[in-house]
Amino acid sequence: MLDHDVRSYELIARAFVGEPGGLSRDDVLDNVTHYWLTNTAISAARLYWESKLAFFDAKGVEIPVGVTVFPDELYPAPLSWAERAYPKLIHYNKVEQGGHFAAWEQPQIFSTEMRSTFRSLR
């Protein structure tokens, strides 16, 4: 779901003026229509509201973790934070395109990052 923040507004604006940026005008309209017609925007956003205080306080994550930083993400996690939050950080990378819904916006980049993250665990 597109959020109500500056990054989301910029992403939507780029889509509507025809600039490249990951989302097309149809993508934005599909997303808004999906939440409007199913009346699920509030329940989809509930996760963010409930976890707002704990987001920066990740504790007890004992499995291997990979972090990819997308430029249009709501919070681009710095390496120093990722290392503190995830003691078993096995992959950290910054990419040039994508945002909060990277798998939807940039599926090729997302799948490449997933493969890179878990290649060492094979």
Residue ranges of predicted features:
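C-terminal subdomain of alpha/beta-hydrolase-fold enzymes, centered on the catalytic histidine
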Residues: 1-122
